[in-house]
Amino acid sequence: MVKCSISSIGNVKSISKSNNLSSLSNSSSSLQSMNSIQCGGGCGNGGLLGGVGGLVGGVLVGTGVIVGSVLHGVGSILTGGSNNCGCN
């Protein structure tokens, strides 16, 4: 069971809005933040919209690690995997 936190999701939004790719120097940290998006659908009313929003952000940032993570997250949401996630 994956736990996601609102603070991590907020961090992803701020990264997505940044035009400075050097802010993503720590890819493992970015990957962990994106993992929170995968279970964002289980937190509040995010659902599929949350996954699509994350996908758009990942494309804007343009890094393979983030795009790959978000695509995996959207796949989990479409298959109902997000139902196994919870919030802190």
UniProtKB/Swiss-Prot annotation:
InterPro entries: HssA/B-related. It comes from the Eukaryota. Pfam families: Coiled. Belongs to the hssA/B family. This is HssA/B-like protein 19.
